[in-house]
Structure formats: structure tokens, C-alpha cells
């Protein structure tokens, strides 16, 4: 089995039902509070992909100073559009500080922990291990075609 980079198929339908709020300013909701999102790391032997509907500890990394469920994504750039693409990117890199993750991992699941841990997207990268170090996933430029979340 292998992890596959993809936007969760369930996320696409959930957007139409207003489950996910990436912005504190949302005219579609009466309460202007952004949802809380997290980023969990997954083993290279796991299977997270477009069919992943929610966060699960199955296949998630374990190790020193890594908290099950991953890290909280502190904030997102305001969702916007350009041409026919809607997009947003977290405002800061994903940083896992002083961790030891001895088993190879190669994916991060972004999920909405305010809405039943619903999956948003899976992002893959080269297989990694970390020994008493900081692992950082640098965020892409927040623009159409490069943002972490692109809906075309």
C-alpha cells in the first residue's frame, strides 16, 4: 500500500454543505469563527488518499515528542479566487519540534478537527525519518495553482 497525494473526495461534497470554514470572516455563517485544522503525519506503509474521509490513528507515526493527531494549523490565508480557481494556504509551515520518528513516513493528512475530524487533503513527500530533530513542511506560495488547497 502507498499514500497518494489528493484532495479528499468527501471534502469536495462537504464544501457544498458548508462543513469547512477556513476563515474567521464567513458571510455564510452567523458565527464568524474559523474551524480548527490539524496536520498528522503518516507512515510510508499507510494508505491515506482521496478516499480518506476522516483522521484515523491507523498508520499515523508514533515517536518521541509527536502527539497523536498531529499539530494544530494555527491560521490560514484568507480564502480567495483567481480566474476559475479558489485557494488557500496555511500562514505558517508545519513544524514538528524535537521529534524522533524512526519509522519512515511520507505523508501529511490535513483535517478539520472542529467538524468530526473530516479529511481535507493528503500531501506526500520523499520518505523521511527524524532523530531528535525538527521536521518542517514549508508551505507553498498562496496563489492559484500553487496553494496548499486549490479548487479549480
Question: Where does each model-flagged region fall?
Answer:
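Small cysteine-rich, disulfide-bonded extracellular modules of the LU/uPAR three-finger superfamily
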Residues: 1-106, 113-152
